[in-house]
């Protein structure tokens, strides 16, 4: 939410938001790793969410993969003039949905994570609005 507000009120902030998103992904991976070392298994919300070693390991893999995707895609986005503030925010929303799905123990929590992830991926599929194939891909994906 902070990144969206920053992008609205500060002009030409796509580079700042991109770097802050990379920092957020790394910080979340470090926090997930540190919190996992001291705790065995934690349940939240009446055992709807379970946090254990396996889920933390999968979250760290997801976070590092998103970090790599954001790092690699910056040059592509700059080349095709698609370097906008929405891209890293959509990636972060998708990663949040993945992390919810990883820790879910109930079907409704899994579905909430799936919807959060898929909504961000719908928008990412149609990110290049000027191309016909991008609009077609988003329509077919939806």
Could you say what each language-model-derived stretch is?
Residues 1-142:
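Alpha-helical transmembrane segments of multi-pass membrane proteins predominantly involved
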């Amino acid at each position: 939410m902070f990144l969206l507000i920053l992008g609205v009120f500060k002009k030409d902030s796509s580079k700042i938001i991109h770097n802050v998103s990379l920092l957020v992904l790394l910080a979340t991976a470090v926090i997930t790793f540190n919190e996992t070392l001291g705790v065995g298994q934690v349940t939240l919300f009446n055992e709807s969410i379970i946090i254990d070693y396996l889920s933390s390991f999968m979250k760290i893999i997801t976070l590092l993969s998103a970090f790599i995707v954001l790092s690699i895609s910056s040059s592509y986005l700059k080349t095709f003039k698609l370097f906008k503030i929405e891209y890293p925010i959509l990636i972060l929303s998708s990663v949040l949905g993945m992390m919810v799905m990883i820790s879910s123990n109930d079907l409704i929590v899994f579905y909430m994570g799936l919807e959060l992830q898929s909504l961000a991926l719908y928008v990412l599929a149609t990110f290049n609005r000027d191309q016909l194939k991008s609009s077609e891909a988003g329509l077919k994906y939806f």
